[in-house]
Structure formats: C-alpha cells, structure tokens
Design a protein with these regions (language model features):
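Conserved GNAT acetyl-CoA-binding A-motif
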Residues: 115-127
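Short, Lys/Arg-enriched N-terminal segments with co-localized hydrophobic residues
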Residues: 1-10
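Acetyl-CoA-dependent GNAT
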Residues: 12-14, 18-90, 95-97, 110, ...
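Conserved acetyl-CoA-binding loop of GNAT-fold acetyltransferases
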Residues: 138-148
Length: 160
C-alpha cells in the first residue's frame, strides 16, 4: 500500500505507516501536550478500539523521515446507521514536541485522500469543545460544524 507523502520545512518526507509489532511500543509512548490530554484518548486506547473494530478502524502512524511524530485513526463504515460515523477521523495525536510543524495537517489530508480513494463524498471529525480544543485546527482545514452533537462533542464535516 502506498500513502500520500509530502515535504514540510525542507526535505523531510512525511508518510503514514501501519502499526506493527516493531513500532507499537513507540506508538503507545506518544503523548500530546498536558493541556490536550482531556481532548484525545491515548494511542494505546485507540489501538484497543481498533482491535475490536477490524475492517472499520484505520489506525496509522505518522512519520517525518524515520521519526515517529504522531498517530491518526480514521473509520470507514459506509453502512453505519449514524451518518457521521460512516467516514471520519476518530483520533489525531501529534506528540507534544512535534506540534506546529504541519504533521497534523498532513495526517488529516492523508485520511481525506484515503476517503476519496474509497469513494467517499465527505468526512467528519468530532471534538470536545473547550479552551484548548482542536476546533480552530479543524476549522482551518475546512471542516464545518453540522449543528449536531454526539455525547457532548461537536460534529463537523468536510466535503471531499
């Protein structure tokens, strides 16, 4: 499988990679900034959720060159009765020391490219509102709140 690649700040090649026995430990060690912890689950929890939903969850690691810088998990479930869970981003964890370098944007764009490849017309993301929420980040990328909420989280959608 090949995934979108991009260059950010010089010659660093960004890529997504599957989680394997060789990188799962490092993936579980990724941590966001302390003020972000209430907004995103740890990678280990995300991987446990992915394990329980094979064929739906799409967990990937974000690399800048050989450095593991983040984790993203999407979901592709076209038959889901809840429309905003049919195609979307479930998690985005960029390690604290690697934020504000374009890696999160790359990860989201890579998920959207995968969604397009799968024939999806839109994708969603949910976030917990609050002072340090990822809302401004997702709005800058083109996601728009739908007016819906799920368990207190804002539902936003982007057309592909």
């Amino acid at each position: 499988l090949s995934y979108p690649r991009a260059n950010v700040r010089g010659m660093t090649t960004l890529r997504l990679a599957e989680v394997t026995t060789d990188n799962v430990g490092a993936a579980c060690d990724l941590s966001v900034a302390p003020h972000q912890e209430r907004y995103v689950a740890p990678v280990a929890r995300s991987l446990a959720e992915a394990y329980t939903q094979p064929g739906v969850a799409w967990p990937r690691l974000v690399y800048a060159g050989d450095d593991l810088v983040g984790f993203v998990m999407a979901a592709f479930d076209p038959g889901c009765p809840i429309d905003y869970f049919r195609c979307g981003i479930w998690r985005l964890n960029i390690s604290a020391e690697h934020q504000k370098k374009g890696y999160g944007k790359f990860a989201v764009e890579a998920v959207l490219a995968e969604a397009r490849r799968r024939g999806q017309e839109s994708a969603t993301v949910l976030w917990v509102p609050g002072e340090h929420s990822p809302e401004p980040f997702y709005l800058r990328l083109g996601f728009q709140p739908t007016g819906q909420q799920h368990e207190g989280e804002v539902v936003a959608r982007i057309q592909l």
